[in-house]
Amino acid sequence: TMADRRKALSGAHTDHLLEGTARALMHLNGWSAEQSLAFVEACEQQGMTTKAFYRELQAPLKGERLLVDKTPWYIVDVDILKRVERDFVDPLYIHLVRHPLGMVRSYEESSMQRLLPIATQEGSFGSRELAELTWLLAQQNVREIAKDVPPGRWLQVRYEDLVVQPEAVLRRMCDFLGIAYEDAMVNPYDDMDRRMTDGVATASRMSGDLKFHLHNAINPDAADRWKRFYSEDVLGRETREMAATLGY
């Protein structure tokens, strides 16, 4: 339920994530922050399910636009991923993959180990190991659910291809989604106020890519930047084997 969601995300490092739903309502309905937050609170108090709340998000779209949910943490819980298939009619999946050490480097730069779900358990893993474990768990979960999704509703995209050949990859994604390609798609850092990368208030913490506002253009060098910091020898055997199945 929405109340369960609030309980799960209430915490020093995660409470800002609660604003995502309100921010979406602001964008979809043209509501103020106060209106959106009040609506979410009412949904929580009514015991509304998350499935029903998604229906509230889809209603303003009127079948003319697509509802996109880009929540990376879903991928570490296979039960959440299975609910996507159960709660939606023929959902489309874009599986964005990246070399494990590219992901590790990004997570370490953002100190994302503070937010990693598996990092809440006591252990002696460092930030690099936690990031690698998260990457491996994510790919294992994806493999588990992908076998039950028809190929026509699943598209795998390599991060490295996306930053090196953005237009070609984006055109393929558009064909998959059944939407028209637009030149503005290769300039994601333009019109940032329309990207829903902010919170409901000026002082809100960002709930998406923590480094988004540090960039002004797609940088192809990001594809292999990790090679300056790591050798593939640091990866565990299972991680290397999984990476090989993804073409790395």
Give the positions of each predicted feature.
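PAPS-dependent sulfation machinery
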Residues: 1-74, 78, 86-87, 114-122, ...
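PAPS-dependent sulfotransferase catalytic domain
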Residues: 44-61, 78-79, 90-186
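Generic alpha-helical structural element
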Residues: 73, 131, 162, 227-231
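Short, mixed-charge, low-aromatic patches
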Residues: 5-12, 35-42, 91-100, 124-131, ...
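PAPS-dependent sulfotransferases, especially Golgi type II membrane carbohydrate sulfotransferases
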Residues: 44, 108-112, 116, 139, ...
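General structural signal for secondary-structure boundaries
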Residues: 6, 10, 18, 32, ...
